[in-house]
Structure formats: structure tokens, C-alpha cells
Amino acid sequence: MSPQTETKASVGFKAGVKDYKLTYYTPQYQTKDTDILAAFRVTPQPGVPPEEAGAAVAAESSTGTWTTVWTDGLTSLDRYKGRCYHIEPVAGEENQFIAYVAYPLDLFEEGSVTNMFTSIVGNVFGFKALRALRLEDLRIPISYVKTFQGPPHGIQVERDKLNKYGRPLLGCTIKPKLGLSAKNYGRAVYECLRGGLDFTKDDENVNSQPFMRWRDRFLFCAEALFKAQAETGEIKGHYLNATAGTCEEMIKRAVFARELGVPIIMHDYLTGGFTANTSLAHYCRDNGLLLHIHRAMHAVIDRQKNHGMHFRVLAKALRLSGGDHVHSGTVVGKLEGEREITLGFVDLLRDDFVEKDRSRGIYFTQDWVSLPGVLPVASGGIHVWHMPALTEIFGDDSVLQFGGGTLGHPWGNAPGAVANRVALEACVQARNEGRDLAREGNEIIREASKWSPELAAACEVWKAIKFEFPAMD
């Protein structure tokens, strides 16, 4: 390097470490319509001011590093840096703050959830200045939303494909989740679909194991659903899990499902990864397959209240990446889910425009500009006594999925499916007649059980089942 070049590079450059807040804390900043906005729950280490912590998050998730570098002078930091533009304390929590960060859109590759998350929830979560960090919400600007395909088909197209309207859809996860042969698995699928369910489902960890290879499962399940369709006159589906060890193998399984003529396949989007999921969603749209999404591994990311990422962010990411269904919790079953918070991200999955509402955990107004919606799937420890509450909470545009609540029926799989279908039809009819499902739900189920022995037997088996545990965290 020549002396002249050295002199030029060193002009205005001072080596060393600067406080992040001098560059990245900008409370006067006016956010732009094109900015990606993030709300982080920040727990600073003792002695670290909240402004410095918020600025550190903005820096480490955008252009910053631990020291000043001379190459900063070769670009426009003001154009590309993230900015912490507001900080507020969290009510009732000691040393916790919500830090709002704005990111310029040019920081992100178009149509890539993978790239967006690599920046926003990447290395910054291991930053030593923070005791804990949680991403509570994201505002995805319209200009970025329009770079994504989103769900392969969406709610209305799915209803048209299935020719089913005016009620939630019914599903069942085949149990035991592991260990059945393909033929016995297909038998359970047939019995549940014949009994009145719309869908049956592979469990999330059913891929291609020694006891049941994927091709055998696909063949027996396809035979089962076509037989059930012929006998009931209704369109049926089974979520064939295409998740695999490589993207190439995943697409091979999706191709085989399409060749069989089945309507829907499935993917584990967190363990499989967003790149794989987006690729599969594109294939499904191009080839007329619905795509069911399981959220296995979500609690590793979202269960801690002060660290990780709230599921509403994962739900938004899924709507961008692509999926026609996604598991969303039940509010009433065996898995965690607070009612208002759950309904907040259910609206973010289904609705075209969602207003800011902090009481439901929605930190930003979100405009999806007609990106197709995603059906929330309520699944986990639910049975016929939960049907009125589920119908009232989730409404028509949902999938209610009863695994043990179908297959655990004392008379067998088909009667278990009948019991759930009768309970659902009774609840929908009662709601349409103006009855209050929240107040009269148990009575509605009892009335229906008088003319349905299958429902009466189910009511007796599960009358005392509750999943109520004191929260310890």
C-alpha cells in the first residue's frame, strides 16, 4: 500500500471501542414505512444502561461490531445501520425493557426468511452485555411482504378444494406416533376418515424409519383415504410428512405424493428449516398440494418468558415462508397457550390486516396486503368436552385435531371419529341458532349425546380429564 493510500484511509479514523449508544441509539428517529421494526424484551447485565443495551442489540443485529473498523468509512452507516429508537420499561418486571429497533430494508435479501432471521435473531442473542433477550414481535413492511409467495394456497382455496364450508375442519393424529407398520397405520387412517374426520395426520417425528418406510406409508394412506372418500362422498386428506434429511429427498417425497393424487402433505418447518420450507411451499403451489406445517421444536425457542422468540414471530415467519396450516396451541388442552395472546397470533395468521393491540401481544400494526391466510390448528390433549370452547375460540377457519381424543374411544377409531363429528356439528348448529357456547357448551354436548351412542361413550370416558398444572415459571 502506498503512503498516499495509507494517509487517505486514516483520515477521520480513530481506532478503539465506542459506546454503542453514541451511534445506534437514536430516539429522535422517525420510522419509515419500509423499515422492518422489531420489539425486543431486553434484560441488561447489572450496570449496563438500558439505552446502551438497546443500542447494542441494534448494532449487533445490523452493521456493528465490537470495535471501530476503518472500513466503516467505505460505506454509509447511516443508510444501513439498525436504530434503537425507543425504550420502555416492562411493567411489573425488574430490569426488563422493551427496546424498539428499526432496520433498513436494504439489509435483507428479498423473499428470504432465513436471511431475515440470521440478522435479527443471530449472534446478538449470545451478547455478553445482555442477561437475556427475547424478540416479542416484528413489523414486516408491505414492500418486504410482497417479495414472498406466502402460503401455497390459503384458506379460501383450501375450502374450495375440499368443498367444505361453514365449520371448522376436523383432524386426528395417528397414534401411537411410532412403531406401527404401514398397513396397520393405513387401517387407522381409513377408520378415522370413514368415521367423519376431514383429515388424519402423520405425527411430526414420523419420517422414514425401519418399522415404516415413507413410501409404504404413502401408499397405504392413499389407499385408505380414497376408500374413505368413496364410502362417505366427502373429500378426505392425510398429512403425509415429507420432512427428510435433505431438501432433495423432501422434494422426492412430495413428488410421489402428488403422483398418488393426495390433496395435502406436511413439513416440520422449524427442524426442517426455513429454506427447505420455502422450497416445499413453492413446489406445493406449483403442483396443487396443500401444505400442513408442524411446529416441533417451537417451545425450545419460545417458552422462556425473557429469552428467545415469541411464537407470534414464528407465526409471521411461517406465513411469509409458506404453509396452509400451522399448529397454534389450543388454550384448553395439554399444551401451553393463553387465550388472548393465542388469539392475537391466530389473527396474524388468518387476517389480512391486524391492528396494534398490546393486550393481545401485538406490538405493531401488520398489513399482509392479501398474502393468503393460514389455518390455525388446535391440537394437543383435547376431547369432545372441549368442542364448544374450541368452536367458540377459533371459529370456522381452523382445524381442530383430536389424536387421543379420537383413537382413545373405548369402541375404536371410527366411533371416536363419529363422536367428534357429532359434537362439532352440534356446536356449530347451536352457535348458528344463537346459543352461547361458552355458557351452554356442556349442555349442548349432553343433548347431542342422547341420540349418538358414540358421543355418549366418549363423554363418559373423558368427563374428568383436565390438564391443569400451576405455572412454575
Curated annotation (Swiss-Prot):
Residues 1-2 form a propeptide. The modification N-acetylproline is found at P3. CDD domains: RuBisCO_large_I. The keyword Lyase applies. SUPFAM superfamilies: RuBisCo, C-terminal domain, RuBisCO, large subunit, small (N-terminal) domain. Pfam families: RuBisCO_large, RuBisCO_large_N. It is found in: Plastid, Chloroplast. The active site is at K175, H294. HAMAP family: RuBisCO_L_type1 (MF_01338). Belongs to the RuBisCO large chain family. Type I subfamily. RuBisCO catalyzes two reactions: the carboxylation of D-ribulose 1,5-bisphosphate, the primary event in carbon dioxide fixation, as well as the oxidative fragmentation of the pentose substrate in the photorespiration process. Both reactions occur simultaneously and in competition at the same active site. This is Ribulose bisphosphate carboxylase large chain. The lineage of its organism: Eukaryota, Viridiplantae, Streptophyta, Embryophyta, Tracheophyta. The gene is rbcL.
